[in-house]
Amino acid sequence: MQYPFQEVESFWQKFWEEHKSFQTNIRSSKPKFYCLDMFPYPSGAGLHVGHPEGYTATDILSRFKRMKGFEVLHPMGWDAFGLPAERYAMQTGIHPAITTKDNIDNFRRQIQMIGLSYDWSRELSTTDPDYYKFTQWIFIQLYQSWFNPELKKAESINELIRRFSNQGSNGLDYRQFNSEEWKNFSPVEKEKILSDFRLVYQAEIPVNWCEALGTVLANEEVEEWVGKGYEVVRKPMRQYMMRITAYADRLLEDLELVEWPPSTLEMQKNWIGKSEGLEITFPFLKPLQSGLEGIRIFTTRPDTIFGVTYMVVAPEHPIVSEITTPEQKQKVEEYQKTSSLKSDLDRMELNKEKTGVFTGTFVFNPADPSQKIPVWISDYVLYGYGTGAIMAVPAHDQRDFEFARTFGLKIIPVIEGEISEAAFDSKTSTCINSSSSEISINGLDYTSASSKIISWAESKKIGRKKIQFKLRDWLFARQRYWGEPIPLVHYPSGVTKPIPESELPLVLPNLEEFKPSGTGESPLALAKDWLQYKDPSTGEIGTRETNTMPQWAGSCWYYLRYIDPKNGRFLCDPELEKKWMPVNLYVGGSEHAVLHLLYSRFWHKFLFDIGAVSTKEPFDKLIHQGLILGEDKRKMSKSLGNVVNPDDVIKEYGADSLRLFEMFMGPLEMVKPWSTRGVEGVFRFLNRIWRLFHSGSQESFRLDDVEPTPEELKILHKTIQKVNEDIPNFSFNTAIAQLMIFVNEFTPSDRRPKKVLESFILLLAPFAPHIAEELWKRSGKMESLSYEKFPEADPQYLIESEILIVVQVNGKLRDEFKAPKDVSQSDAISMAKNLDKIKGILEGKTIRKEIYVPGKLVNLVIG
């Protein structure tokens, strides 16, 4: 007799859909539980068996919480814009709107086959204009805001305009102008100043350009695409940026508010990269024609300032052309061209050969003006980090050491230590060779020396103590078609303005030709009718922005839209947002441990500042599921031929087998190899459960109206206790193991006590919902078990009358025995000695010591 899984699973999936079993009552008075999966990018390949792992875990918890009396929000949607979809469309020749819809339909079909309890009435896609209307709305709010450093929060740009009108730039770390000067600036001049404060701004920056992809890549995306074989070079372009750096402190500090894996917290902290140090200017021997007096650098090691023997400026730094002497101009320009062909990843490679060119210019060391210091350019310094220039201390920095060795530059030790073969970097040694007519720090440790140098620099007004972040502003524009249009218009007057909010969504035009131009222009530049825009308030004709948003944009706020997906007026009803946020549990791959989470947190904090959300953080608890590898223990890949399709597994063994096996493989966070034999084993377990409730033919369902024995109640309540403990802790494998123990205990018996086995069905339901629903129905119940009360353990059946005591001889485990819970020391030792195995070991030996650890072990020491 075999469990008819195909018939059962088909029936219950149809039942859940028709009865809308998992639709959330969003205004329910029950306690809420918001359980969210990172929504997938719907690729043409469809799901493989690694995808359902996280989905099954959240489904188990969601079903468990419903049965515990919670109102559960458990939605699903699609992160469907972006470069992969566009590339796939170009390969197939089919428009991305069509391929994306087909891919979504396939993903949805596969997910529904697994029996996941999503509320499909809340399904969303980032490509839906009704959705990206609010992605564009958030963009406009960011564009129309600035970050007030005094309040440490965003404000309307109108507040900044009022401030400039009343007091100029007084009190801001910005070039100074008064209110009268502000009023006399032209609209273009005013806009240029405001752009330096807006949370969205344009900047001419060196970007990562990929000719083959026809687009700019964010620094964070380069590694992925280079890994796929694409060449990425540096190219100066005018790009839209988001001022995420304004939120660096809050992004760092508020990590204390969340319950995330330690490794993820560490990655977030490292990416933000807070460091304290000294910002100081090294003056030119004579000021430049532009009036620039020196090169500004930031260092975390002020104590090593006397060890500076040269300076390095990034090749793409704007001052390079200004500081290069005529004699060095050709060499410098050739080097700049060569370095532009390298990605930041290549340039940061620690073991690469150091290259560079002398600019012909010198500065002097402000701590020791007698020291004339040459200024070089080298690609191991990046313009986007710090100030784009460094003071090089080769004695105490390995990259500087290698560069100095390559070019024969001086190496001056200023910290006690050995530097003959490598740089010596220490914060525990004292300073040497660090004295001048200006200041001396000889004999001081790192802390004292750094503090003294900073105080001296501030007193001389040539430097200041500063907090620096590794975090860079977010490169937000992409030169591609398949993304959210940016709702800005450029006017001939030189002013850029957002379109009125009443005109949102700005719908992506339907282009037949959507391949990259190769010039750096987006394909949207081809939409001639769409490009032209007339300002409704002034009548001025402008040109729409043709770049589109990155794929990250739509995924920054989707968790809010699930709460109120049909709201046409606002991204989420404030009352509902207040009830349902933050997300209680967020589950997804660790590959999103930095970027998606960082960008979502940034947007959420901005929305908090403008009153659109009520919480400081979007995601309370975070869990990363481990990868499921192929049977060959390598990452699943079409090229390796080791991909396992869930459709095939479900067809052969059923959805409940797939669910149970993926949860039984091991701890959720661990990397685990797939095993078809393992699925077969779980399938046999489901058949044993089926036979436990049936005898003879399929129809002979059996439950007995008999009182359970104390032993039966004991195993039941032990199972109830274990499952109740393990599900909230994501210990699904040990919960399933306990369910297996239960079945093993009951299978040999001819008794089928109804009270016990009905409770077992409810315990099984979160893990294997199809078979559980069918058994529940066959037991005579008229309703789905989805909202039945989850069993709770009765403490009286959890009391153990016996304990297990292990026996060691000379500290090595030799045997074990059961004893009464209150066994005395003498009885426990006596029982241990009388075990057959122990008797054999003790024969002819002298017991020198007897040790008893109450309730745990007996250790006999023999000579």
UniProtKB/Swiss-Prot annotation:
Q: Which reaction does it catalyse?
A: tRNA(Leu) + L-leucine + ATP = L-leucyl-tRNA(Leu) + AMP + diphosphate
Q: Which UniProt keywords apply?
A: Aminoacyl-tRNA synthetase, ATP-binding, Cytoplasm, Ligase, Nucleotide-binding, Protein biosynthesis
Q: Which Gene3D superfamilies match?
A: 3.10.20.590, HUPs (3.40.50.620), Isoleucyl-tRNA Synthetase, Domain 1 (1.10.730.10)
Localization in the cell: Cytoplasm
GO MF term (any one) = aminoacyl-tRNA deacylase activity
Q: Can you supply one Gene Ontology CC term for this chain's record?
A: cytosol
Q: What EC number(s) are associated with this protein in UniProt?
A: 6.1.1.4
Gene Ontology biological-process entries? leucyl-tRNA aminoacylation
Question: Matching InterPro entries, A to Z?
Answer: aa-tRNA-synth_I_CS, aa-tRNA-synth_Ia, Leu-tRNA-ligase, Leu_tRNA-synth_edit, M/V/L/I-tRNA-synth_anticd-bd, Rossmann-like_a/b/a_fold, tRNAsynth_Ia_anticodon-bd, Val/Leu/Ile-tRNA-synth_edit
Motif segment ('HIGH' region) = 40-51
Binding of ATP, residues = 638
Q: Name one Pfam family in it.
A: tRNA-synt_1_2
The main place the protein resides is: cytoplasm
Residue numbers of motif 'KMSKS' region?
635-639
PROSITE patterns recorded: AA_TRNA_LIGASE_I
Q: Which HAMAP family match?
A: Leu_tRNA_synth_B
Family to which this protein belongs: Belongs to the class-I aminoacyl-tRNA synthetase family.
Protein name, per record: Leucine--tRNA ligase
Source organism per UniProt: Leptospira interrogans serogroup Icterohaemorrhagiae serovar Lai (strain 56601)
